[in-house]
Amino acid sequence: MSATSSKETLGFQAEVKQLLQLMIHSLYSNKDIFLRELISNASDAADKLRFEALSDAALFENDPELKIRIAFDRDARTLTISDNGIGMSRQEVIDHIGTIAKSGTREFFSQLSGDQKKDAALIGQFGVGFYSAFIVADRVTLTTRRAGLTAEHGVRWESEGAGDYTLETVEKPQRGTEIVLHLREGEDEFLSDWKIKSVIRTYSDHITLPIVMKKTEWKDGVETPTDEDETVNKASALWARPKKDISDDEYNEFYKHVAHDFEPPLAWSHNRVEGKQEYISLLYVPSHAPFDLYDREKRHGIKLYVRRVFIMDDAEQLMPQYLRFVRGVIDSADLPLNVSREILQSSRDIDAIKNGSVKKVLGMLEDLAENQPEKYVEFWKEFGKVMKEGPGEDFANKEKIAGLLRFASTHTDTDAQVVSLKDYVGRMKEGQTAIYYITADSFAAAQHSPHLEIFRKKGIEVLLLSDRVDEWLTGNLHEFDGKPLKSVAKGGLDLGELEDEAEKTAQKEAEESMKPLVERIKAMLGERVKDVRVTHRLTDSPACLVTGEGDMSANLERLLKAAGQAAPTVKPTLEINPSHALVTRLDSESDEDRFKDWANLLFEQALLAEGGQLDDPASFVRRLNGLLAMLPG
């Protein structure tokens, strides 16, 4: 469209209408946030200009002093926030103001809870803070021009927050963005110098850009702006200040700025590293998970600066995938200003910064787990599943990550993941040499698995793993504190010193006496099983299925197939309980057809008990009904 195009009216994306209503009605009691959001956006625009100007200084247009200006007009009842940052082109206005990113809309609205505090957190998280202007304004006018375009390529966007907005091309000599809020009736407090400065100092003191207002003076009992500017905020990089000079409130507000979050963080770590590498890191652990936590392709949360100059958002090379929830800033004194993402991938300096930062985050989590366990429980509920990716990604810190993991177990027998491996080892029975676990596709399936029967009888604790990522975890974490991790559903069971001689003798006798039955069942089941043997892991169930020590677990096989991935079919071993009535009934069965039905029923119910699916459910039902019909009436 040409620079001289006339005004046009465009409709908001449907989701934007919903969002505007949410902003106006749900967040009113927390309305000061609109100013923080607009200032934060202006600060981001300045950061982007600084970065683009590294390769094209002409973008500064002889105006390199970046600032945010705030002004109010009592007569017109307007509040104006302007910046001389990067600005926007016409298409960028349509993309960023008229729509919300398509990928995020469904998740956004599915997560709205009606809880004002939680919904406010989502708004920041989805990067839609601009719309908070409508909390206090019934009309918003945005005028902008992108750096590098000529004055006639200015764009004016205006909306009353209903179903549509207007867009027109205007002259704008200065680059950057100006937002004029036409205040609603009853919002006169935002026409007060004191109120605006109070909000800025509360929420935006840490913004590195100067936030400028006209000084005011009192004349005849009326507060009147003068021609003299004053900077309202501290306008210095918070992370570069000494820790002792920064209050908890300042740390919290800075987090909300860098993370676009409305909730305070769970913990933070502020460090200045000197020596071979010189850098400052200010890293935060959020108090809640972002909506896209499990999308490994989505943005990371670390902003990279070089000597206070913003370089890039979402610098994925600075934090491994399993710590993708960490937010914050890293400011290097050594990297070149023209550093690119490609350079980051092969930079030893970046590797050193990453390694140091990971250690700080893990140390912060260790401190939380040890000194504030109730907070760590909250952390684990939000981020536990991604932490379980760690041992497979970060070999150097595997033991440290393992110490941070939490699980459900038979010790508590609830689905709360509160048991650490250190806790488990501390409770191991005398003579126990392994850490036992079971994986299943639900907590109930793990908790009630027949594989646990002998362990429950002997009081041996078993970890109950039911997260999808647990299969990945156990495939990469093989031991802790010198103790191997062993699945109770894999391989032969050898409890060693945990069984007495009488038990071992009884097992051998049962194996010997059941040999003919074992051979009959094996012949009858044929290709359905790898082997059949007598078990000593069952006390109440007639049978269970186990896989080989080096084989893929049945649960992992199901997960892969459900995800549409190729997975080898692993034949299980059927283990039978020699003391169970069904097994003794089978042993005495002389009719070959009935024996076949009993043997298949035994296998199929063992398959169901471990969460498996039957290839032919109708045959299972037919067999079961036939055998039930034979019972005495």
UniProtKB/Swiss-Prot annotation:
Subcellular location(s) per record: Cytoplasm
GO cellular component, one term: cytoplasm
HAMAP family: HSP90 (MF_00505)
Region annotation (A) ranges: 1-341
Family: Belongs to the heat shock protein 90 family.
Function text: Molecular chaperone. Has ATPase activity.
Name the UniProt record assigns to this protein: Chaperone protein HtpG
Region feature (C): 559-633
Gene3D superfamilies cross-referenced by the UniProt entry: 3.30.230.80, 3.40.50.11260, Heat shock protein 90, C-terminal domain (1.20.120.790), Histidine kinase-like ATPase, C-terminal domain (3.30.565.10)
Main location: cytoplasm
GO molecular function, one term: ATP binding
Oligomer and partners: Homodimer.
Chain intervals for the UniProt region annotation (B): 342-558
Annotated source species: Thiobacillus denitrificans (strain ATCC 25259 / T1)
UniProt keyword list: ATP-binding, Chaperone, Cytoplasm, Nucleotide-binding, Stress response
InterPro entries given in the database record: HATPase_C_sf, Heat_shock_protein_90_CS, HSP90_C, Hsp90_fam, Hsp90_N, Ribosomal_Su5_D2-typ_SF
Signal sequence interval, chain numbering: none
